[in-house]
Amino acid sequence: MTDVARIAQAIREAGLSGWLFYNQFHRDEISDLALGVPRAAHNSRPWAYLVPAEGEPTRIVHAIEPGILEHLPGRLVRCTSHDDLFAAIGAAAGPGARLAAQFSTSFPVCSFLDHGTAQLLERLGIALVSSEELIVDCLGTLDAEGEASHRRAALALHAVVHAAWSRIRSAAAGGAAVHEADVQEWIAGLFAEAGLVTDGPVLVAAGAASADPHYEPVDRGRQLLPGDVVQLDLWAREPGERSVFADISWVGVLAPAPTAEQARVFDAVVSAREAAAAAIGAGLADGLSGAEADRKARDLIARRGYAGGLRHRTGHSIGTRVHGYGVNLDSVEFPDHRRLREGSCFSIEPGVYLERFGMRTEVDGIVRGGRLELTGGDRQQRLLDLGGGA
């Protein structure tokens, strides 16, 4: 159920007049998620929902789709024309209103309000402010139910990755040919046994393919060969729209032990992961941002001589979408200067990608009680291998 009171509280804390949700064709996923509008609902006409800092919200709908916001509180206004729609928004906002809306110069993932509509709203005398901070408060943190589902998924993924590597090890010992798609299928089966669902094939990358952070195999993919680095990246959740994802990455070598170069790269990414986690734990009370946490990991990797192997941010928000709408650990791609806060859930996944291979280690963390807690089982401290590495 949509917590309109929580939305209003966030608006007041931001010092704004209100938050304008505006959608058509379900283009604004944030509006749908925040307000609990089902994707199956007809949305061929625009609707607006204005939550004020104080007072009653206003539901503005087209007469042909009057029920799309019926589950929400507030005064109902029905429109049949473009002029009616914007007149109703202007009347609900009031003179000199400062309204949050879904746009951002920093985060394209939050930018759903089109420029033309923004211009029309500004002609009404409305000052528009990015909703990027409000989104974190209302969609980018986990409640107790979401946290519990995330923790269960994280533990299950930990078991799955070890079961998958055990099967890889057994196949190698028996001389069986194994391709990347085989491992993907094994993991899909393990997900089903564990009662997990996901949104696509997991990442399995062998040899030079491990240097591609978002690699996708063609047909059966590459055969796993002796000496290969094998990168596994798994994400899944329990069934249900309110369930929260977990997302982990483990890496191994198809050999009894890694080469010296493989060991150096692995040590760099593990050390970067630990540096980011330590910085978050130490900096939460001072309002540490996602960008600051990212820089800790990046700086360590650069000091180890692998700055040229950096390809992506250190982590992303996690929610009911595997890439959620909370704070990201990012100082480069889309620098995130929003502070990590109570209920923030995110990955910590530094990686180094060279010409012959790449490596990434990924754990998930949640801020609870002012502390960082890493979820799931024990985090990876040594490479998986064909000897005793686990």
Where are these regions (language model features)?
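Active-site neighborhoods and metal-handling regions in enzymes and metal-associated proteins
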Residues: 1-390
